[in-house]
Amino acid sequence: MAVRTAEIENFLASAGWAGADHSTLAEDASFRRYERVTRSGEQAVLMDAPPGKEDVRPFLRIARKLTSLGFSAPGILAEDTAAGFLLLEDLGDATFSRLLNAGEAAAPLYEMAVDVLIGLHKCPPADAVPAGIAPYSDALLIDEAALLVDWYLPAVADEDLPADGAAAYREIWAVLMPLVSDVPKTLVLRDFHVDNLIRIDGRDGAAACGLL
């Protein structure tokens, strides 16, 4: 993916970060790019989301909503929604995956993550769900659950699951959906996993769990 160097420098200059040093961060499963920018000892994260391929506005709505509820989504330092640039608070490198790989105890990390989910479910839907965010449908939930048979099992078994097996798995979830509908509705964080959760020292409770 082409790097929009001149546009990035203009955006950073307009945000007061002219001349900042850049280092590339890991990409995610999208067209977005991320860079850590450093200036006079300060750090921030640049999101480059090319218009036409990505839209930063849903990210902004959800990040601001989570922050307003006391959770630790990245703060928004500067934005150019038309150009697809955001300058974000740098939450650090202590992702749960790195901590676990380094031998940290799993239980405290997962307890922290569960505290976030409990906190979200305590928020009335009218308070937790930003305006303009589509409902999380049964079909979408089944699609997410089917990632197990579409991707994980084939990778582990080194062969595709037979089509009738994958269909049967989806049918089981369809039968379970009425039970899910009884659960109170709240905001759903679709990428809530160890690579997108960060321990933030100096914050307490659910706020100690950074959300990417």
Where would I find each of the regions flagged by the language model?
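Regulatory N- and C-terminal appendages and interdomain linkers associated
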Residues: 1-24, 31-33, 41, 54, ...
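An alpha-helical support segment within catalytic cores of ATP-dependent transferases
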Residues: 4, 8, 13, 125-135, ...
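Short, conserved clusters of charged catalytic residues that mark active-site
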Residues: 7, 29, 58-61, 71, ...
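Short coil/loop linkers at secondary-structure junctions
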Residues: 18, 72, 158-162
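Structured loop/turn residues at beta-strand edges in well-structured enzyme cores
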Residues: 20, 71, 207
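Glycine-rich loop motifs involved in handling phospho/adenylate chemistry
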Residues: 23-26, 50-51, 136-137, 189
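Active-site acidic catalytic loop and adjacent metal/ATP-binding pocket
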Residues: 24, 31-38, 46, 76, ...
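ATP-binding pocket architecture of kinase catalytic cores
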Residues: 32-143, 147, 153-157, 182
